[in-house]
Amino acid sequence: MRNWLLLLTLFLAGVSSAQSSNELYQIISSVSKERIQADVTTLVGFGTRHTLSDTISPVRGIGAARRWIKAEFKKIAADCSNCLEVREQHNLVSKGSGDRIVKDVNIVNILAIQHSKKNPKRFVLMSGDIDSRISDPNDYTNDSPGANDNASGMAGTIEAARVLSKYRFDYG
């Protein structure tokens, strides 16, 4: 949690030289460890988020996790008059492309993009690793809840989107 706050602080200091110190403190203080913990719990609840796991089930696997993350980003966007652009990035990886790719897989990243109000070509891109795995990298059916294997990072990313969506930045 401290590392996450440090990264958020450094990010905000770097992109927002025009923002007041008070506004930066407001942004940082609005980060909620309870929301982050709730999001980690939700991500763990998908059982496994292995790259090769189920993409159809509404409650289990990488597909369910991706849909939930996308829905969270869309809720955040709706709360800020669509200040976030929510997108999917697809990449087909063929079987045999690596030691742990035992079947063709469509890898999908979920992105939330907050454009600068001055220059729309400048933006903050929020995304993170979604997947999790257990010791056997080719076991994509058994539970691998991964609270500390990408769930915490993705939960931090969702929280960053929640917090940053309340502000508009002038990335000159």
Regions found by a protein language model. Name each.
Residues 116-123:
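Proline/glycine-enriched tight loop/beta-turn segments at coil->beta junctions
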Residues 3, 90, 114-116, 128-130:
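Short, flexible loop/turn elements at secondary-structure junctions
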Residues 79-84, 120, 168-172:
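Short helix-terminating capping/connector loops at secondary-structure junctions
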Residues 112, 126-172:
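Alpha-helical metal-binding/catalytic segments enriched in His/Glu/Asp
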Residues 22-31, 49-62, 96-101, 139-150:
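Second-shell loop/turn segments in exported
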Residues 1-20:
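Bacterial Sec-dependent N-terminal signal peptides
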Residues 20-27, 32-42, 58-72, 110, ...:
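Stable alpha-helical elements in mature extracytoplasmic
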Residues 38-115:
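A non-catalytic alpha/beta surface segment that caps or lines the substrate-entry region
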